[in-house]
Structures are given as C-alpha cells and as structure tokens.
Amino acid sequence: MKRLLSTCLLCALLLSLAGCGAKKDVLTAPPELSVTNAQDASVTVSSGSYDWNYALGNGERSGAIACGAHPLDENCRDITPVLEMPIAVSASHFYVVTLDFGDCAPDSVSLRYWSGTCWGDTEAQSEAISAERQDDGTYTAELIPSVGIFAVDASWNTDDYQGRACYVFAGESGGAVSGGQ
C-alpha cells in the first residue's frame, strides 16, 4: 500500500512539474545599450525614459512608464555616461559608433545630437542622426566628432514585449586620429 501511495505521489509530482517547462525570459524593461567607437572605447547606458509592456505568459500583459529627465537637463550632466571621441584632423570627418542592445535588438533606432554648449537649454533644437541596422542586430551611426550630447531613441514590437526607450550619453574629445575610419 505504501508503495502504491508513493508511486501515485511521484506521478502527481511529475505531472505537476511537466507544466513547468523552461520558460522563455521576457524582457520586463528596456535593455541596456552599449555604445562603442572605432577605437573600442565604450560606455554602457540605461534608458532614462521609456514606455514598456510585456506578456505575463497567461494571456495578460503588464507594463511601466518611466519619465526621465530631458537629455539636456543640467542636473544630469554629471551622471550622464561619457564616450571618449577622438579629435578629428578634418572638420568634415565623422566617426562610426556601434549601438548594441545585446540579444534584444530594437526594430528601429534614431539619434538626436546637441552641441555641448546646450547643457541646461531644454529648448535647444537637436540635429537628427540616422542609424543603420547591421546583420548581427547591432546598429551603426556616424557621429559628429565633437563634444556633445546624444539621445538614442529605440523602439521594439515583438509578441513578448514592446515599447520605446530613450538613452542619453555625451561625447567628449579624446586623442587625435588621422585618416578615415
């Protein structure tokens, strides 16, 4: 009788665990962004503002909205990640950076640029910079080779998660380089 009871309990346990197969991780917030320049200097950026929702796995969804500071907010200047940019030998020289969101490549990415003199001026107009998706899911963009503030706007639309996020970093002049990159 004990053997039959033990066997029944074991079967019940196995059946209950069968429904607990490996679950796919669902992104519950926007991923971090890694920005790398051609000289392999990089900076990791978390999203400041986002609108995000994701599947709970039971037919329901959940989400969050985070309203971060404006990219030019003077109070955020000291905590904004800084990517060292080489000094150009030509005023017309642009630098390519790679935007990597890990395993969660967005559907679209665009950038906005402001001069470093715009810190604190939240009414300043930005310049648009396009980003091009690569085969590996990263994006590349040509940045203006000067001190400045860059906002990366990304959007996702998958069955498991969707939303928009803004990432901000600053470019700072570094060592001189010559030739094309």
Feature locations, PLM:
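Edge beta-strands of extracellular beta-sandwich domains
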Residues: D160-S173
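Positively charged n-region of N-terminal signal peptides that target proteins for export
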Residues: M1-T7
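Bacterial signal peptide processing site
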Residues: G21-K23
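Mature extracytoplasmic domains of secretory-pathway proteins
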Residues: W52-G120
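Short beta-strand segments within Ig-like beta-sandwich modules, predominantly Fibronectin type-III
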Residues: A128-D135
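Conserved structural position at the C-terminal beta-strand
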Residues: A154-W156
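Surface-exposed, short loops/turns at beta-strand junctions within beta-sandwich domains
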Residues: T140-I149
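C-terminal motif of bacterial Sec signal peptides marking the signal peptidase cleavage site
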Residues: S16-G19
